[in-house]
Amino acid sequence: MPRMFGTDGVRGVANTEDLSPELAFALGRAAATLARERSGGRVVGVIGRDTRRSGPMLAAALSAGICSAGGDVVDLGVITTPGVAYVTTHLKADFGVMISASHNPAPDNGIKFFSGDGYKLPDEVEDQLEALVKARPDTMPRPTGAELGSIRQSPEAVEAYVEHLVSTGSPLSGLRVVVDCGHGAAYRLSPEVLRRLGAEVIALNTAPDGLNINAGCGSTHPEALQEAVRAHGADAGIAHDGDADRCIAVDERGELVDGDQIMAICALDLKARGQLPNDTLVTTVMSNMGLEMLMRRHGIRLVRTKVGDRYVLEEMLKGGHGLGGEQSGHVIFGALSTTGDGILTAVQLLSIVAREKQPLSTLAGRMQRLPQWLENVRVGRKEGWEQNQAIQAAIARAEAEMAGQGRVLVRASGTEPLIRVMLEGTDMAHIQRLAASIAEVIRTELQ
């Protein structure tokens, strides 16, 4: 049987077998049971969610499960994923849970756990949760009376998170910023944080109805943000995904500034101020070679990991590095957060713009990107693609044709039925043609 936990928690279409209220209840019971076994006493779990219609349903089921196993719940309501991580540590809770499917469409949802120190759970702890959920008969405790858990709200904990974000930034007075919240978890928090720092904020897509999260807006659909930045004569634009654990930016000309460029700007700034531990940036195999070349010129070592912010974070913790992230806009500031935080990233980026007194386009222009092309191939099954001889032959042909003037990266998505084909080289038309040829073989072999 496939593992219940994927690369970013449990995901599925809400109210189906993959992500039912019954499963949420069982996961809540398992989390509280495991936490009680470790602490030997009363435990507290923090729960947050994004703006999907299924969020309150799953939060109620999860809360019921935690309480039924003798755990107390702090329900934060709508908050960002990094907000849950921060509040978990701020309240010294035993664990945190975020209900979100990030950039996925509204019918999807997910359940992601954090340990008491604010980090995502390691695989072995997720496996323990899964074993408890699947165990028959259910041997988890069922306390009664005063031993049952309770549920409370904590707006003051959410305010503590907002104050933390504000405390990390420089004054932004004089900056005009457009923020696309994608009708997601950041719809109140992101504009509020930037306004408290003094920015003039024009907020887009801040009216969630449970169904419009990520719908033609947010970080995966930046076109309206680009247009708004130009129309308002703004200094920058910021776009979040559904749970705001990442952001992308738009410069004053309406041009996209992706995660690679954001990391480049932040790494150079931190190094100049003597605050880049080990003079190292951690990123993934997807990051553009232009980032690596720029870092090398400035004496910054670039370390690559597998795709996924959890792998970036693992490498950061292992090596004692302070900055890492992904091209998609997940950026982790190790001294300020335990996970990628889109609002925090926006604050750091805009603070550099304010301090440097230079346009964002100038700062982003320090990195010259090599042409890069990504094909997402929807497949009937992902399993076994690495052993498929026809697919491997197609990859080998493309690599031979590039003759060392670029690279080919093919990988399976951890959360969707997709095989991702990424090529990087010196000529866009050439790499597009090669990517299409690999994609066609994948479609044929894995339909």
Curated annotation (Swiss-Prot):
Taxonomic classification: Bacteria, Bacillati, Bacillota, Clostridia, Eubacteriales
Top-rank taxon: Bacteria
Binding site for Mg(2+): 102, 241, 243, 245
Record-linked InterPro entries: A-D-PHexomutase_a/b/a-I (IPR005844), A-D-PHexomutase_a/b/a-I/II/III (IPR016055), A-D-PHexomutase_a/b/a-II (IPR005845), A-D-PHexomutase_a/b/a-III (IPR005846), A-D-PHexomutase_C (IPR005843), A-D-PHexomutase_C_sf (IPR036900), A-D-PHexomutase_CS (IPR016066), Alpha-D-phosphohexomutase_SF (IPR005841)
BP-aspect Gene Ontology terms: carbohydrate metabolic process; peptidoglycan biosynthetic process; UDP-N-acetylglucosamine biosynthetic process
Family classification: Belongs to the phosphohexose mutase family.
SUPFAM superfamilies on file: Phosphoglucomutase, C-terminal domain, Phosphoglucomutase, first 3 domains
Reactions it catalyzes: alpha-D-glucosamine 1-phosphate = D-glucosamine 6-phosphate
Enzyme class: isomerase
Cofactor notes: Binds 1 Mg(2+) ion per subunit.
Role played: Catalyzes the conversion of glucosamine-6-phosphate to glucosamine-1-phosphate.
Active site: residue positions: 102 (phosphoserine intermediate)
Species whose genome carries this gene: Symbiobacterium thermophilum (strain DSM 24528 / JCM 14929 / IAM 14863 / T)
Record has Glycosyltransferase as a keyword: no
Name recorded for this polypeptide: Phosphoglucosamine mutase
Name of the gene this protein is made from: glmM
Modified residue annotations for Phosphoserine: 102
Keywords, comma-separated and alphabetical: Isomerase, Magnesium, Metal-binding, Phosphoprotein
Listed PANTHER family: PHOSPHOGLUCOMUTASE (ALPHA-D-GLUCOSE-1,6-BISPHOSPHATE-DEPENDENT), PHOSPHOHEXOSE MUTASE
PTM field: Activated by phosphorylation.
Keyword Magnesium: yes
EC number of this enzyme: 5.4.2.10
GO function term, MF aspect, one: magnesium ion binding
Cofactor (UniProt): Mg(2+)
Record-linked Pfam families: PGM_PMM_I, PGM_PMM_II, PGM_PMM_III, PGM_PMM_IV
Gene Ontology cellular-component terms listed: cytosol
